[in-house]
Regions:
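Post-HExxH zinc-binding segment in Zn-dependent metallohydrolases
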Residues: 43, 94-172, 180-206, 217-222
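Active-site recognition of the HExxH zinc-binding catalytic motif
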Residues: 81-94, 191
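Pan-zinc metallopeptidase signature
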Residues: 159-285
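Active-site scaffold of zinc-dependent metalloenzymes
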Residues: 10-76
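Charged, glycine/proline-rich intrinsically disordered loops and linkers
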Residues: 9-19, 26-30, 122, 131, ...
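Extreme N-terminal leader/anchor segments
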Residues: 1-18, 82-88
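Mature extracytoplasmic/lumenal regions of exported proteins
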Residues: 76-79, 91, 105
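Aromatic-lined carbohydrate-binding surfaces of glycoside hydrolases
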Residues: 73-77, 99-102
Length: 285
């Protein structure tokens, strides 16, 4: 936390750790939400007293609290994956270009969070149907066995997406292009990081103290990313998960499949979309 945040917090204690981190434990909860695992902003000028005013702050409930609210997160390993997903968002926002772009989108009244995007997905049937077609095309492109086939499928994806975004603009008098591109980049790469972390989780030795004293640490627990359900979790749409994360993840899969050097400019050029980098790669006019 930055030094100026201290004036906005009534009481806190500093948690000791083995890393060069400054971790605060608030004496009182920041809000009344029993479960939180999210990087949050406040933009409203009336919220200047909050520590996350125009600044991304990760709010995280303890494993014990989360187990009460989310039955599927029932051990330390699962909790840590959720935490590291959000910590990766913190890393993304630590890049000046990304944070500056977020603030600019808000100031220009072009900002929507992922929850707001998901509302359109859940409530607008035509919007949702198009997203399903788009994601199916992305999955087919990932599975394609030739570059020519892949290019044809991806070209169709771009057409379907462009038509949906045009229809949205006509209907709601608001463009989604920039904000969808932004969230696909951030959430798609976070999900890819999460999946890779699960695949390599056993290579990271847990601290002996955790193994000995943490009652929620599951000693025989292991992730199996080859299970069909795990593969589907990332690549297939589910109303309970952000659609933008799924399409973003599949775009990242295509970039990785073709060894596109997208990581070099991933956060340096905040407004550069994943789908455009693939369009350049396929040389689609």
């Amino acid at each position: 936390p930055s030094p100026e945040m201290k004036d906005k917090v009534s009481k806190y204690s500093v948690l000791e750790n083995d890393y060069d981190w400054s971790i605060w434990k608030l004496k009182m909860p920041f809000d009344s939400t029993p479960y939180v695992m999210e990087t949050q902003f406040q933009f409203n000028p009336k919220a200047k007293v909050f520590i996350n005013y125009r600044r991304p702050v990760l709010f995280c409930s303890s494993p014990e609290w989360i187990r009460r609210e989310k039955e599927h997160i029932n051990n330390t390993q699962l909790w840590s994956i959720a935490l590291l997903h959000e910590l990766y968002h913190q890393y993304q926002y630590s890049n000046d270009a990304i944070l500056t772009y977020v603030l600019r989108l808000y100031d220009e009244k072009k900002w929507l969070d992922m929850d707001s995007l998901q509302v359109y997905y859940l409530k607008d049937n035509l919007f949702k149907d198009s997203i399903k077609v788009e994601n199916d095309l992305l999955e087919k492109a990932v599975a394609a066995t030739s570059l020519d086939e892949e290019k044809k499928i991806y070209t169709q994806f771009l057409k379907v997406r462009a038509n949906r975004q045009k229809d949205f603009l006509k209907k709601y008098k608001y463009t989604l292009v920039n904000i969808e591109n932004f969230w696909e980049k951030l959430e798609g790469t976070s999900l890819m990081m999460e999946k890779i972390l699960k695949e390599n989780f056993t290579k990271v030795a847990p601290p002996p103290y955790i193994v000995e004293h943490d009652e929620m640490y599951a000693k025989n627990f292991a992730f199996n990313e080859k299970e069909k359900s795990e593969i589907q979790f990332y690549s297939e749409l589910d109303d309970k998960r952000f659609y933008i994360g799924t399409t973003g993840y599949n775009l990242v899969q295509l970039l990785e499949k073709n060894k596109v050097a997208y990581k070099e400019n991933l956060y340096k050029y905040a407004s550069l979309p994943l789908d455009l980098q693939l369009k350049y790669f396929y040389k689609i006019k």
